[in-house]
UniProtKB/Swiss-Prot annotation:
The gene is PEX12. Component of a retrotranslocation channel required for peroxisome organization by mediating export of the PEX5 receptor from peroxisomes to the cytosol, thereby promoting PEX5 recycling. The retrotranslocation channel is composed of PEX2, PEX10 and PEX12; each subunit contributing transmembrane segments that coassemble into an open channel that specifically allows the passage of PEX5 through the peroxisomal membrane. PEX12 also regulates PEX5 recycling by activating the E3 ubiquitin-protein ligase activity of PEX10. Belongs to the pex2/pex10/pex12 family. Disulfide bonds: none annotated. It is a multi-pass membrane protein. Its main location: membrane. This is Peroxisome assembly protein 12.
Length: 359
């Protein structure tokens, strides 16, 4: 039985084809980096909204731009994405087995480079936006934010009904491809690699030497520049390369930090964490920073600060502790991403509905 399993796991279509463990590990690397950076930006934005609130509001776009620079840098210099290069892999143009292989240091051909960039950067961005849209529409539908006569109601309800099945089909497509890869029936573990016209292979010793040689040459050589246009082009190229190199260095260090966090929060360390965090709840502050003269704060505790009417569907903001009508605060937070009273960065997920005994 073990012999049969070993045969299956080593049944590669190509000799330099990486194992399923390597390709899954490199796939999960960038997947782990995004939420980690998002959490860091969230903490900074909550601690100083004036300086870091912009980065929280536009996190997806900023991350996509930096990811684009990073992936372009690696694809054009190592024929691999950042995570693939981190695990010693490279992208090989499909159908080039009969021809001399292009060295990894030469980068991918332009057509395959842009296809790879689109699937590595643009597609994840669109997927994140689609998931946020589905989550937002689901919450609006659950609490009937839209009026019954809304023309969009039928459309977004159809979208909400179809989205889980489309997502399931998408994930099933990837799972099927991975199973075929494990059984040696496919040379791509991901359908996106096939669409990009490339496959993954391991870096050879010659590839590693050539990449290191090219990096050392780039730092030493300075080509004579003739025109102002060439100077600007070279300066932009160096700036982009410097940003990408800084990102790659920071991410390389961050990867080890993420692995440490993964170990820290593993099941083996749960008892240690509980013993450290099982501290008594501190008493409430004697004096709260409460400005009774604020025009937004009503005199009666049952009045919503936004609509100035008796609250309906009491909802508290976890970021500030103030209570509003659900409809009022939902629309405000969705538009401004902040608490109406304190201005603290706030998302729809911070809304907590209250159910009093009187209701």
């Amino acid at each position: 039985m073990a012999e049969h399993g070993a045969h299956i796991t080593t049944a590669s279509v190509v000799d330099d084809q990486p194992s399923i463990f390597e390709v899954v590990a490199q796939d999960s690397l960038m997947t782990a980096v995004r939420p980690a950076l998002q959490h860091v930006v969230k903490v900074l934005a909550e601690s100083n909204p004036a300086h870091y609130g912009f980065f929280w509001r536009w996190f997806d776009e900023i991350f996509t731009l930096l990811d684009f620079l990073l992936q372009q840098h690696y694809l054009s210099r190592t024929s691999a994405s950042f995570s693939e290069h981190f695990y010693g892999l490279k992208r090989i143009v499909a159908g080039s087995s009969q021809q001399p292989q292009r060295p990894a240091s030469a980068g991918l051909p332009k057509e395959h480079l842009w296809k790879s960039t689109m699937f590595l950067v643009l597609l994840p961005y669109l997927k994140v936006k689609l998931e946020k849209l589905a989550s937002s529409l689901r919450e609006e539908d659950e609490y009937s934010i839209h009026p019954p006569s809304s023309h969009w109601k039928r459309f977004y309800r159809a979208f909400l009904a179809a989205y889980p099945f489309v997502n399931m089909a998408w994930e099933g497509w990837f799972l099927t491809q991975q199973l075929r890869y494990i059984l040696g029936k496919a040379e791509h573990h991901s359908p996106l690699l096939k669409l990009a016209g490339v496959r993954l292979g391991r870096l050879t010793a010659q590839d590693i030497q050539a990449i290191e040689h090219r990096l050392s040459e780039a730092s030493v050589m300075q080509d004579p520049v003739r025109s102002v246009g060439e100077k600007i082009k070279l300066a932009l190229k160096k700036a982009v390369g410097g940003i990408a190199l800084s990102l790659s260095t920071g991410l390389s260090v961050g990867v080890f930090f993420l692995q440490f966090l993964d170990w820290w929060y593993s099941s083996e360390n749960q008892e240690t964490i509980k013993s450290l965090t099982a501290l008594p709840t501190p008493p409430p502050p004697v004096h709260l920073d409460y400005n009774s003269d604020s025009p937004l704060l009503p005199k009666m505790k049952t009045v919503c600060p936004l609509c100035r009417k008796t609250r309906v569907n009491d909802t508290v903001l976890a970021t500030s502790g103030y209570v509003f009508c659900y409809r009022c605060v939902f629309n405000y937070v969705r538009s401004h991403q902040a608490c109406p009273i304190t201005g603290y960065p706030t998302e729809v997920q911070h809304l907590i509905k209250l159910y009093s005994p009187e209701n």
